[in-house]
């Protein structure tokens, strides 16, 4: 837990900064949904999604390359994760970040119907997969379980939302 908390602090700090981009457009997206036609909404959504992918993709690559050197410098070599664990942490960061545009539009436009059971399914799947994978892959298995549960539920369900 102590090792992960260092990575969680750093990844969470980057996530908070990038999340402000989408927090800033939430009201405008709500107004867009109330005043514009479906074509314009889709165009703005695709632009926001593209920007989100670039921002979170660039940040994920930077985190992958810079997390271990920073943790070693700040906390010491004994607090390092293997590169494979850092990779899956960065993949989780990227996947969750690329969902921000969809979540912003969903929240602003009230499109909650499609994912009403998603949280329950994702939590159950995360628990089962993490328990199964931790036996073979230790810490990496827990993060792989989280990644797989996100891919198998959130990404799939959020693609059903018609923006």
Predicted regions and their residues:
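Membrane-interface helix-boundary signature
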Residues: 42-46, 79-82, 86
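Short runs within selected transmembrane alpha-helices of multi-pass transporters and secretion channels
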Residues: 8-11, 15, 19-23, 65, ...
């Amino acid at each position: 837990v102590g090792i992960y908390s260092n990575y969680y602090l750093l990844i969470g700090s980057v996530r908070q900064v990038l999340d402000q981009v989408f927090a800033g457009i939430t009201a405008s997206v709500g107004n867009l949904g109330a005043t514009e036609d479906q074509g314009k909404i889709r165009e703005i959504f695709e632009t926001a999604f593209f920007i989100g992918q670039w921002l979170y993709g660039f940040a994920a690559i930077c985190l992958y390359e810079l997390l271990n050197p920073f943790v070693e410098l700040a906390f010491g070599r004994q607090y390092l994760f293997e590169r494979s664990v850092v990779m899956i942490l960065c993949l989780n960061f990227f996947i969750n970040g690329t969902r921000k545009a969809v979540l912003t539009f969903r929240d602003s436009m009230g499109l909650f119907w499609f994912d009403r059971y998603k949280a329950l399914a994702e939590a159950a799947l995360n628990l089962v997969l993490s328990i199964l994978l931790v036996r073979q892959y230790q810490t990496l298995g827990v993060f792989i379980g989280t990644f797989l549960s996100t891919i198998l539920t959130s990404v799939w369900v959020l693609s059903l939302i018609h923006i």
